[in-house]
């Protein structure tokens, strides 16, 4: 049976388990990477470096929730449209999602670059680690234009009923990130850790967007495919979630 249609036919429980288990394992793999990343930085560098990464990561969460909102909105649109949309309609939807996502990613990166030092001061980052935290954060933000389409593509593929491919890619990029951490953190410090993460995001984005293009689209991109009605739907579903998550993080961080 075609995996992307298996949730719509046959017994519900086995199909749901086959779909949900890879998602759970994806979350486990992501958490394992986060722990491994912290351990490598803690073992290879000093306490100040680890504190700088921790402070930068707290601020970066504000920008990452923008990505999370786009993921949720994109996944909902794809899952809602998949059962009835034609291949060409799905192609248009996916291109519009990726286009809007990339524009938002570039804008978010620019805002992050400018506001990062002020946001770090706002959370009382110690002066002695401020420059290191800014360095880590800005290198990490350079990967955001790849992280956002990577995350969105994973969510769109899952919205089409395939949760195994995103799991495989998450495991592969996590392993790549850890290996690059081991290679780069020692000689380059927190900059190496951020560069390792950005490189893994680039690799994940390239693979997932190519996979989405190969399996779910029937035409090359054309500017004529961009339509305002898709943009309205994207913002309608994505913006409230992004604002809700980001505002909660801002309030918790500042307080």
Would you name each region that the model predicts?
Residues 174-206:
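Membrane-interface helix-loop junctions in multi-pass transport and translocation proteins
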Residues 35, 39, 66, 106-117, ...:
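Membrane-embedded alpha-helical segments of multi-pass transporters/permeases
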Residues 41-61, 127-132, 191, 195, ...:
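Interfacial/gating helices of multi-pass transporter permease domains
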């Amino acid at each position: 049976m075609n995996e992307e249609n298996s949730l719509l036919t046959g017994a519900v429980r086995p199909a749901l388990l086959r779909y949900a288990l890879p998602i759970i394992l994806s979350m486990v793999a992501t958490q394992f990477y986060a722990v491994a990343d912290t351990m490598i930085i803690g073992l290879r560098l000093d306490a100040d470096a680890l504190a700088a990464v921790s402070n930068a990561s707290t601020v970066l969460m504000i920008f990452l929730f923008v990505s999370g909102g786009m993921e949720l909105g994109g996944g909902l649109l794809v899952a809602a449209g998949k059962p009835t949309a034609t291949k060409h309609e799905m192609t248009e939807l996916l291109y519009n999602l990726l286009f809007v996502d990339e524009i938002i990613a570039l804008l978010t990166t620019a805002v992050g670059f400018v506001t990062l030092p002020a946001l770090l001061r706002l959370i009382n980052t110690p002066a002695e680690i401020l420059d290191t935290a800014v360095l880590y954060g800005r290198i990490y933000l350079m990967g955001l234009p790849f992280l956002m389409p990577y995350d969105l593509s994973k969510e769109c593929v899952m919205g089409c009923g395939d949760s195994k491919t995103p799991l495989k890619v998450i495991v592969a990029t996590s392993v790549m990130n850890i290996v690059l951490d081991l290679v780069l953190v020692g000689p380059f410090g927190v900059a190496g850790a951020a560069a390792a993460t950005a490189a893994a995001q680039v690799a994940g984005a390239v693979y997932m967007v190519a996979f989405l293009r190969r399996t779910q689209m029937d035409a090359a991109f054309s500017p004529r495919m961009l339509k305002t009605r898709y943009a309205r739907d994207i913002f309608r579903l994505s913006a409230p979630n992004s604002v809700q998550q980001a505002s909660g993080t801002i309030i918790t961080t500042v307080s």
